[in-house]
């Protein structure tokens, strides 16, 4: 049930970094480095994410490596490749940082937690595991308050850039 004056977002939002950052700072996070790997006009891309990971070698102060939108890539294999590279980056190349990893979302409602964990453990491999951790199950929460809701309906598409005019029209 949608109340008057609320914003209803339907569909999957692949671009979650803004909300991830809101939660990071709301829970005591401070200094944070963000590497841009594209725009809303671009689809999420494994190679762009890996290029962004490579750029982190230029900054020595980084202690925690997180790529939260990697779980929104097209396949479990793409997520696996990124996470293996994150562990290698932290444990082999830099040796001074830690990777926070996510477990790929359920394929469907019949997928059980044990299967998700088994797939993750099989895919992640055995290299540099002391340089990373996976937190599971996911914590689903909202970072949008009632005062942020306007009554408009917005439907996510594969490319949010196509909806940029709808977003700019919302007061």
Regions found by a protein language model. Give the residues of each.
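Surface-exposed assembly/interface segments
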Residues: 1-171
């Amino acid at each position: 049930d949608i109340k008057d004056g609320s914003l209803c977002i339907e569909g999957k939002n692949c671009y979650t970094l803004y909300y991830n950052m809101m939660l990071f700072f709301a829970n005591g996070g401070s200094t944070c480095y963000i590497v841009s790997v594209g725009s809303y006009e671009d689809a999420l891309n494994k190679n762009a994410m890996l290029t962004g990971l490579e750029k982190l070698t230029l900054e020595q102060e980084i202690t925690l490596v997180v790529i939260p939108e990697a779980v929104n890539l097209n396949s479990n294999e793409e997520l696996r490749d990124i996470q293996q590279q994150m562990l290698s980056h932290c444990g082999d190349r830099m040796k001074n940082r830690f990777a926070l990893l996510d477990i790929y979302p359920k394929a469907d409602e019949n997928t059980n937690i044990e299967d998700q964990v088994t797939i993750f453990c099989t895919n992640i491999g055995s290299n540099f595991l002391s340089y990373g951790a996976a937190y599971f199950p996911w914590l689903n929460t909202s970072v949008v308050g009632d005062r942020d809701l306007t009554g408009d309906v917005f439907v996510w598409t594969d490319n949010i850039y196509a909806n940029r005019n709808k977003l700019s029209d919302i007061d």
